[in-house]
């Protein structure tokens, strides 16, 4: 990121609510770009959540040694957990896909599955439709 962004986030004179707003409007959209199409694994969501919390702690001026709860930091900055936003984005995209006509290219790429394709050994990869079904539960 540009040094000017870090200057805003590190400056102690900038109110924390404003830092949270800045985070929600610039940094989080960059992290979530294209996330509606990802069939994410728990490990990926966990890694991104850890990176997000590290950044939020840094914005507040706290470290892990300060033993401040994650929920308290999120409340101070007015930020919701990454996983909730990821589910929102995925379900919003699912609504767009559902409203498209059946001959639209998005239907052939996402919702159709080739049953005659041989899959490799091991656990089958999570598909986008399976991720949506998990979000709807």
Regions from the PLM with identified roles:
Residues 1-137:
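Short linear motifs embedded in intrinsically disordered, charge-biased segments
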């Amino acid at each position: 990121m540009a040094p000017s962004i870090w200057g805003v986030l590190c400056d102690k004179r900038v109110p924390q609510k404003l830092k949270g707003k800045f985070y929600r409007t610039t940094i989080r959209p960059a992290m979530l770009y294209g996330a509606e199409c990802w069939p994410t694994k728990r490990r990926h969501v966990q890694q991104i959540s850890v990176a997000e919390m590290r950044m939020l702690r840094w914005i507040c001026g706290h470290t892990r040694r300060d033993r401040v709860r994650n929920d308290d930091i999120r409340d101070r900055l007015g930020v919701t957990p990454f996983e909730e936003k990821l589910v929102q984005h995925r379900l919003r995209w699912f609504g767009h896909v559902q409203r498209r006509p059946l001959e639209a290219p998005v239907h052939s790429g996402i919702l159709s599955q080739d049953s005659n394709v041989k899959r490799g050994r091991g656990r089958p990869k999570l598909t986008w439709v399976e991720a949506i079904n998990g979000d709807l539960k």
